[in-house]
Amino acid sequence: MGKQPVKLKAVVYALSPFQQKIMTGLWKDLPEKIHHKVSENWISTILLVAPVVGTYSYAQYFKEQEKLEHRF
């Protein structure tokens, strides 16, 4: 006599339609959170944005000079 497999019922997790307060913590003190993130990471932001803006402006300047060179 072997053991018979026992069928287990699956557990289903669901939210009550009357108690859906999942995202409230995300919006709580949002301006304060944004200020904290910006003041904490401003050096990294500058180091990321400065080369991108510099490269873009150089490319635009070079393209404009090339257009003006072939004008005459």
UniProtKB/Swiss-Prot annotation:
InterPro entries recorded: Cyt_b-c1_8-plants (IPR020101), Cyt_bc1_su8_sf (IPR036642)
Topology term for the membrane: Single-pass membrane protein
Residue ranges annotated as Mitochondrial matrix topological domain: 1-41
Purpose: Component of the ubiquinol-cytochrome c oxidoreductase, a multisubunit transmembrane complex that is part of the mitochondrial electron transport chain which drives oxidative phosphorylation.
GO BP of this protein: mitochondrial electron transport, ubiquinol to cytochrome c
Lineage: Eukaryota, Viridiplantae, Streptophyta, Embryophyta, Tracheophyta
Parts of the chain that traverse the membrane: 42-58
Compartments it resides in: Mitochondrion inner membrane
Protein name: Cytochrome b-c1 complex subunit 8-2, mitochondrial
Family statement: Belongs to the UQCRQ/QCR8 family.
Protein keywords: Electron transport, Membrane, Mitochondrion, Mitochondrion inner membrane, Respiratory chain, Transmembrane, Transmembrane helix, Transport, Ubiquinone
Source species: Arabidopsis thaliana
Main location: mitochondrion
Gene: UCRQ-2
One GO CC term, this protein: mitochondrial inner membrane
Subunit annotation: Component of the ubiquinol-cytochrome c oxidoreductase (cytochrome b-c1 complex, complex III, CIII), a multisubunit enzyme composed of 10 subunits. The complex is composed of 3 respiratory subunits cytochrome b (MT-CYB), cytochrome c1 (CYC1-1 or CYC1-2) and Rieske protein (UCR1-1 or UCR1-2), 2 core protein subunits MPPalpha1 (or MPPalpha2) and MPPB, and 5 low-molecular weight protein subunits QCR7-1 (or QCR7-2), UCRQ-1 (or UCRQ-2), QCR9, UCRY and probably QCR6-1 (or QCR6-2).
A family per Pfam: Cyt_b-c1_8
Mitochondrial intermembrane side: 59-72
Xref: Gene3D superfamilies: Cytochrome b-c1 complex subunit 8
